[in-house]
Curated annotation (Swiss-Prot):
This is Tyrosine-protein kinase receptor Tie-1. Keywords: Angiogenesis, ATP-binding, Cell membrane, Disulfide bond, EGF-like domain, Glycoprotein, Immunoglobulin domain, Kinase, Membrane, Nucleotide-binding, Phosphoprotein, Receptor, Repeat, Signal, Transferase, Transmembrane, Transmembrane helix, Tyrosine-protein kinase. Residues 43-105, 372-426 form the Ig-like C2-type domain. One of its GO terms (cellular component) is receptor complex. The lineage of its organism: Eukaryota, Metazoa, Chordata, Craniata, Vertebrata.
Length: 1138
C-alpha cells in the first residue's frame, strides 16, 4: 500500500548542507570493511589550502558523527586523524551499532562553507532502504521504499528528522516493501527519514536521505528563472549557482569527461585507495547530489560490477552505443575512429572544441588574452570561432593560429570589471555543425592594505616590521612589497619584496631618524598588484652607548648615605650618552633600587635613604635615550646598622656609698620595640676602659648601678638597642656617698670609725663584684638557652593539619617529616632538594605582609630554569610558618599536573624554608584578562579591528578548560582549594592556565572553618557563607564565578553589591546575569555550578568534558566583537577585597 502525505503534514525539519557554490569535497565510506574496528570514513577536499586552518585562508576539515537524529548507545570517543593538508579520517568504531547513523564532513570557508552528509544503515536491520539517497526537484513526488529484511508482524513507524511522521499497518507491505509517497515536495521536506518496526530497536531501522532542489527540473537561480546547462552522466544541476555537481568518476563543466578508472574529484585528481580501486566505496558529494557508488559499481555494498550495457555511478546509465561503439562500465561508450559523442552518434566531421579549461581566473581591470582551439572537417577558420560573455556580448578573435590538427583563436578581452564574473562560452560553427564549451571566469580584486604595517622592534640602525595586515580584496597574498624612506625626504623609495609569512628587517638606517613606511600586496596573476596602503612613521632608536664605566670608589657617609664615584674610558669624539644609572640590589629583600644621574659629565653621586645594616650589590651603567650600555663590574657594600634615638632626660642620684640610681625617659619615634638599654659607666678623670652594663628589661625607665667605690665621681651615659645600637644620650655626673658625704648632711666620725668603715667598704666591694660576676654568668647561660630555642623554632614549624591533629614539621635533607602528636610514628614526605648555591635571585614578583615571591634562576638536575621562590619574612608569625609549611605539604602530595603550579624543589638556609615553584611569565589570570581590554588601552586598535579584546573566544575558552582540568585533578586527589578565583590562577608558557595558591587547600572531603579571617565572599558557595563548610562542590561554585570572570574579561563579581546584600539575596535565588557576549551554553554551565544544593552541581570531570567539547566545536562561545553599545563588566577594586 502507498500512503500519500497531505501537503499540510510535510516535515519542516531538514539538515542544512550547503551555502554558496559547489566545493570539491568528497566523503568516502569503505563498505568493504565489515569489522567495525577496521571501518573508517575519509573526507577529502580538492580545494586549495583546505584543512590547514586560518593560516591557509580557511578553517580545517571537520569530520564527525551527528547524534541529533539517529542516537546510538554511547561508546568510546572516535579518533580523528589528519593526513596531509586536505584529508581527514575518522576511526575508533568498536561495535556495529557505532556505525549506524548520520556522519558529516564540513569544509570550505566563508560563503563556500559546505557540509557533506552520509547515512549508514545496519546490514542486519529489519528493514533496508532500496535506495538511501533520493534527490528530487521542487514540486516532484518522492517515493521512499523500505525492503523487508527480517519480517516482524508489527506496524511500521515512519519518522522525519527523528520526529514521528506516520504509521503503516504491517499488512500494507507490497512485494515485501513498505512505501512512503511524498507528493509536491518542497525544500523544507529535505532531511533524514526512517522506517522502523513498532517496538523494535532504532538500530534496525531503514534510514533515507531526501534532498529537494530549490527549483523545478532544469532550472536554477533565486527565482528559478535560469536554465541549467544540461548535466551529463548523472550530474545534478545546482539550484543556487547553476553548476553541475558531477558524479564520482566524471568531470567537466557538464560532466562530459570521464576520469580514468579509480579516479574521482572535480579534476579527477584523487585516487581510490588500495588495489581494489573504488570497489566497496560509497561516495558522498555536496548537495544536491548526495551519495552513490563509484563509477562502474552498484549494490548496497557497492561491490557488484555493472551489468553489460550499463555504466556510471550505481550503474544507473545505459550505454546505447551506436556506430560500432563499445560500452565501458566506467566511462560509457568508447567510440571507433571517426565517431564521438555520448553514444558515438556524432561524426568527426562535426567541429569540436578542444582542451578548453573549465575555469579561468583574472584580476580586475586587466585585459587578458583567451585562447580557444577547435578541430573538425571542414577545418575551422578565424571567423568561425567566437567568444560570448555572460551578458551576451560576442567577441571576435583578433588572431588565429592554424596547425595541422587544430585552429587556435586568440581573443583580446576588454578591461575586466566585476560584472564579467560568470560563465563564458566558446562556440565554433562550420558547415559540418557546431560545438560549444562553457567555462567559468572569476574576476578577482587585487588586495589593498586597510592598515599601516606594524613596528615590532627597533634599534639604532634597523627596524623590524610586520608587513602583512588586514586587507580588502581577494587573496591569496603571493608577495609583499614594502617601501620606506626618511620622513620629509624627496629621495626615491627603497623597496623590499618579501614572502607574506615573513617579517621584514630594514637594515643600515640612520639612528634617531623617522622613516615613512608603506606596503603593497599582490595576488597571483597579471595585474594582481593592489594599491599602496596607508603610510606610517617609524623612528629608529638612539645609538647604543658602548662605553663600560668602572667604580673608582665609595664611602659611607652615614648609616643610610653612600657616596659613589666612577670613571669612563677616554675615547675620541663626543660622548654618546644622556646620563648614568646606578643600581643597588638588596639580595636579602629581593629589591632593586635605581638612581638616575641625568648629567653625562657627572662622575659622583650621593645615595640617600638606604637601609642601614644592609648588604648591597652596586653597579653603574651609561644610558642614552632608553638604551643601557654595559654595566660596570659589581661592587659589594655593607652599610652599618642604625639604632634608635638616644634616651631622654638621663638623671643620676647617689643612694649609698656603692649605689647610684639612673632614671630616664624612652626615646621618641622608635622604628620598633627596644630589645635592651646599654649603660656606660666610667670613673671621672680615669684612664681605663669604661664598663658597659645591659638593662634587659626595656620597659623600665630606671636602674640602680651597684658595686661602686665610695666617695668616687662617676660619668654615666646610655643608649637603646633595636637590632643595633642607637645614639648615646647626654653624659651625667654623680658621686657615691662616703668620706663625709651624706644624703642629708655632713657627719663627723673618729679615726677608728674610719678604719672600720674602710674594712666594711672592702667587704662590700668584694661582695658586690662577686654578685655581679654571678649575675653576668647567669645572663650568658640564659642567652645561650634562648638562642638554641630560637634556632630550634626556626627549623620546626607547627600547624593544624586537615585531620585536626597538631603537626610538627621538621626539615632535613630532602624530606619533610610530619609528626602528629596523637601518633608515635612520623610520616615523611619527600621533596626535591635544591642547594642554596644553585639559586640565583633576580626580580621581586610580589610581596605581602609576611612573605614575598622572587623570580630566580635555579639549577636542577644539571639544567637551568626559571622559578618563583616563595619565602617568609623575618618577622612572620608562627601561624604564617604553619600555613607556609602546610602549602609545601600540599604541593608534595599533589604531584605533577600541567594545569597546576607544580613544585620544583625546596631549600633550607639558616633555618628558613624556601619553596621553588613553576614560574608563570604572564602573571595571574585576572590582570592578564584586564590588560586584554583593548577598548580601554588602545581604542583606535579596537575600533579598527572591531574587537573588544586581544584574546580570542577560543583562547578564553581554553583558559576555562585548563582551569577545569586542574581542578579535576585536585578533586581526584581529594583536595579542596577554598580560594578559587582568577587572581589565584596563573598564566604560564603557551598561555596555559594553572591553578595556584594552595595556602588554604585542604586534603580532605569536607572541611569546616573554625578560625577567623578575611573571606573571599564573592566567590564562596552558599553553604560556605552560611555554615563555613567547604567541599569540592564549593570549589565548583567558585569555578562558576571564575568562568564569569573569564567571559567578562576580569570583571568584579556582583559589582555594585555589598557583602551584606549577597548574604541576603543568594539564598533567595539571585544569581549574576548572563553577560551580553556570552553564549547560552556557557551561561547554563555557570548556572549549573551555582545550584543551591551542592550535590546537584556538576563534578569537575563533567565540567572539563563540556568545555573540551566546546573547544572542539570551534564555535565562538564568547563574542569579542564590538557590537552596538558594547561595555565592559564593572571593576570595583575595593569590593574585591571582601
Amino acid at each position: 500500500m502507498v500512503w500519500r502525505v497531505p501537503p499540510f503534514l510535510l516535515p519542516i525539519l531538514f539538515l542544512a548542507s550547503h551555502v554558496g557554490a559547489a566545493v570539491d569535497l568528497t566523503l568516502l565510506a569503505n563498505l568493504r570493511l565489515t569489522d567495525p574496528q577496521r571501518f573508517f570514513l575519509t573526507c577529502v577536499s580538492g580545494e586549495a589550502g583546505a584543512g590547514r586552518g586560518s593560516d591557509a585562508w580557511g578553517p580545517p576539515l571537520l569530520l564527525e558523527k551527528d547524534d541529533r537524529i539517529v542516537r546510538t548507545p554511547p561508546g568510546p570517543p572516535l579518533r580523528l586523524a589528519r593526513n596531509g593538508s586536505h584529508q581527514v579520517t575518522l576511526r575508533g568504531f568498536s561495535k556495529p551499532s557505532d556505525l549506524v547513523g548520520v556522519f558529516s564532513c564540513v569544509g570550505g570557508a566563508g560563503a563556500r562553507r559546505t557540509r557533506v552528509i552520509y547515512v549508514h544503515n545496519s546490514p542486519g536491520a529489519h528493514l533496508l532502504p532500496d535506495k538511501v539517497t533520493h534527490t528530487v526537484n521542487k514540486g516532484d513526488t518522492a517515493v521512499l521504499s523500505a525492503r523487508v529484511h527480517k519480517e516482524k508482524q508489527t506496524d511500521v513507524i515512519w519518522k522525519s528528522n527523528g520526529s514521528y511522521f506516520y504509521t503503516l499497518d504491517w499488512h500494507e507491505a507490497q512485494d515485501g516493501r513498505f512505501l512512503l509517497q511524498l507528493p509536491n515536495v518542497q525544500p523544507p521536506s529535505s532531511g533524514i527519514y526512517s522506517a522502523t518496526y513498532l517496538e523494535a530497536s532504532p538500530l534496525g531501522s531503514a534510514f533515507f536521505r531526501l534532498i529537494v532542489r530549490g527549483c523545478g527540473a532544469g532550472r536554477w537561480g533565486p527565482g528559478c528563472t535560469k536554465e541549467c546547462p544540461g548535466c551529463l552522466h548523472g550530474g545534478v544541476c545546482h539550484d543556487h549557482d547553476g553548476e553541475c555537481v558531477c558524479p564520482p568518476g566524471f568531470t567537466g563543466t557538464r560532466c562530459e569527461q570521464a576520469c580514468r578508472e579509480g579516479r574521482f574529484g572535480q579534476s579527477c585528481q584523487e585516487q581510490c585507495p588500495g588495489i581494489s580501486g573504488c570497489r566497496g566505496l560509497t561516495f558522498c558529494l555536496p548537495d544536491p547530489y548526495g551519495c552513490s557508488c563509484g563509477s562502474g559499481w552498484r549494490g548496497s555494498q557497492c561491490q557488484e560490477a555493472c551489468a553489460p550495457g550499463h555504466f556510471g555511478a550505481d550503474c544507473r546509465l545505459q550505454c546505447q552505443c551506436q556506430n560500432g561503439g563499445t560500452c565501458d562500465r566506467f566511462s560509457g561508450c568508447v567510440c571507433p575512429s571517426g565517431w564521438h559523442g555520448v553514444h558515438c552518434e556524432k561524426s568527426d566531421r562535426i567541429p569540436q572544441i578542444l582542451n578548453m579549461a573549465s575555469e579561468l581566473e583574472f584580476n580586475l581591470e586587466t585585459m587578458p588574452r583567451i585562447n580557444c582551439a577547435a578541430a573538425g572537417n571542414p577545418f575551422p577558420v578565424r571567423g568561425s570561432i567566437e567568444l560570448r560573455k555572460p551578458d551576451g556580448t560576442v567577441l571576435l578573435s583578433t588572431k588565429a593560429i592554424v596547425e595541422p590538427e587544430k585552429t587556435t583563436a586568440e581573443f583580446e578581452v576588454p578591461r575586466l570589471v566585476l560584472a564579467d564574473s560568470g560563465f563564458w562560452e566558446c562556440r565554433v560553427s562550420t558547415s559540418g555543425g557546431q560545438d560549444s564549451r562553457r567555462f567559468k571566469v572569476n574576476v578577482k580584486v587585487p588586495p589593498v592594505p586597510l592598515a599601516a604595517p606594524r613596528l615590532l622592534t627597533k634599534q639604532s640602525r634597523q627596524l623590524v616590521v610586520s608587513p602583512l595586515v588586514s586587507f580588502s580584496g581577494d587573496g591569496p597574498i603571493s608577495t609583499v612589497r614594502l617601501h620606506y624612506r626618511p620622513q620629509d625626504s624627496t629621495m626615491d623609495w627603497s623597496t623590499i619584496v618579501v614572502d607574506p609569512s615573513e617579517n621584514v628587517t630594514l637594515m643600515n638606517l640612520r639612528p634617531k631618524t623617522g622613516y615613512s613606511v608603506r606596503v603593497q600586496l599582490s595576488r597571483p596573476g597579471e595585474g594582481g598588484e593592489g594599491a599602496w596602503g596607508p603610510p606610517t612613521l617609524m623612528t629608529t632608536d638612539c645609538p647604543e652607548p658602548l662605553l663600560q664605566p668602572w667604580l673608582e670608589g665609595w664611602h659611607v657617609e652615614g648609616t643610610d648615605r653612600l657616596r659613589v664615584s666612577w670613571s669612563l674610558p677616554l675615547v675620541p669624539g663626543p660622548l654618546v650618552g644622556d646620563g648614568f644609572l646606578l643600581r643597588l640590589w638588596d639580595g636579602t629583600r629581593g629589591q632593586e633600587r635605581r638612581e638616575n644621574v641625568s648629567s653625562p659629565q657627572a662622575r659622583t653621586a650621593l645615595l640617600t635613604g638606604l637601609t642601614p645594616g644592609t648588604h648591597y650589590q652596586l653597579d653603574v651603567q651609561l644610558y642614552h635615550c632608553t638604551l643601557l650600555g654595559p654595566a660596570s663590574p659589581p661592587a659589594h657594600v655593607l652599610l652599618p646598622p642604625s639604632g634608635p634615638p638616644a634616651p631622654r632626660h638621663l638623671h643620676a642620684q647617689a643612694l649609698s656609698d656603692s649605689e647610684i640610681q639612673l632614671t630616664w625617659k624612652h626615646p621618641e619615634a622608635l622604628p620598633g620595640p627596644i630589645s635592651k638599654y646599654v649603660v656606660e659607666v666610667q670613673v671621672a678623670g680615669g684612664a681605663g676602659d669604661p664598663l658597659w652594663i645591659d638593662v634587659d628589661r626595656p620597659e623600665e625607665t630606671s636602674t640602680i648601678i651597684r658595686g661602686l667605690n665610695a666617695s668616687t665621681r662617676y660619668l654615666f651615659r646610655m643608649r637603646a638597642s633595636i637590632q643595633g645600637l642607637g645614639d648615646w644620650s647626654n653624659t651625667v655626673e654623680e658621686s657615691t656617698l662616703g668620706n663625709g658625704l651624706q644624703a642629708e648632711g655632713p657627719v663627723q666620725e673618729s679615726r677608728a670609725a674610719e678604719e672600720g668603715l674602710d674594712q666594711q667598704l672592702i667587704l662590700a666591694v668584694v661582695g658586690s663584684v662577686s654578685a655581679t660576676c654571678l649575675t653576668i654568668l647567669a645572663a650568658l647561660l640564659t642567652l645561650v638557652c634562648i638562642r638554641r630555642s630560637c634556632l630550634h623554632r626556626r627549623r620546626t614549624f607547627t600547624y593544624q593539619s586537615g585531620s585536626g591533629e597538631e603537626t610538627i614539621l621538621q626539615f632535613s635533607s630532602g624530606t619533610l617529616t610530619l609528626t602528629r602528636r596523637p601518633k608515635l610514628q612520623p610520616e615523611p614526605l619527600s621533596y626535591p632538594v635544591l642547594e642554596w648555591e644553585d639559586i640565583t635571585f633576580e626580580d621581586l614578583i610580589g610581596e605581602g605582609n609576611f612573605g614575598q615571591v622572587i623570580r630566580a634562576m635555579i639549577k636542577k638536575d644539571g639544567l637551568k630554569m626559571n622559578a618563583a621562590i616563595k619565602m617568609l619574612k623575618e618577622y612572620a608569625s608562627e601561624n604564617d610558618h604553619r600555613d607556609f609549611a602546610g602549602e609545601l605539604e600540599v604541593l608534595c602530595k599533589l604531584g605533577h599536573h600541567p594545569n597546576i603550579i607544580n613544585l620544583l624543589g625546596a631549600c633550607k638556609n639558616r633555618g628558613y624554608l624556601y619553596i621553588a615553584i613553576e614560574y608563570a611569565p604572564y602573571g595571574n589570570l585576572l590582570d592578564f584578562l584586564r590588560k586584554s581590554r583593548v577598548l580601554e588601552t588602545d581604542p583606535a586598535f579596537a575600533r579598527e579591528h572591531g574587537t573588544a579584546s586581544t584574546l580570542s573566544s577560543r583562547q578564553l575558552l581554553r583558559f576555562a578548560s585548563d582551569a577545569a582540568n586542574g581542578m579535576q585533578y585536585l578533586s581526584e586527589k581529594q583536595f579542596i582549594h577554598r580560594d578559587l578565583a582568577a587572581r589565584n590562577v596563573l598564566v604560564g608558557e603557551n598561555l596555559a592556565s594553572k591553578i595556584a595558591d594552595f595556602g588554604l587547600s585542604r586534603g580532605e572531603e569536607v572541611y569546616v572553618k573554625k578560625t577567623m579571617g578575611r573571606l573571599p565572599v564573592r566567590w564562596m558557595a552558599i553553604e560556605s557563607l552560611n555554615y563555613s563548610v567547604y567541599t569540592t562542590k564549593s570549589d565548583v561554585w567558585s569555578f562558576g564565578v571564575l568562568l564569569w570572570e573569564i567571559v567578562s574579561l576580569g570583571g568584579t563579581p556582583y559589582c555594585g553589591m555589598t557583602c551584606a546584600e549577597l548574604y541576603e539575596k543568594l539564598p533567595q535565588g539571585y544569581r549574576m546575569e548572563q553577560p551580553r557576549n556570552c553564549d547560552d551554553e556557557v551561561y547554563e554551565l555557570m548556572r549549573q555550578c551555582w545550584r543551591d544544593r551542592p550535590y546537584e552541581r556538576p563534578p569537575f570531570a563533567q565540567i572539563a568534558l563540556q568545555l573540551g567539547r566546546m573547544l572542539e566545536a570551534r564555535k565562538a562561545y564568547v563574542n569579542m566583537s564590538l557590537f552596538e553599545n558594547f561595555t565592559y563588566a564593572g571593576i570595583d577594586a575595593t569590593a574585591e577585597e571582601a
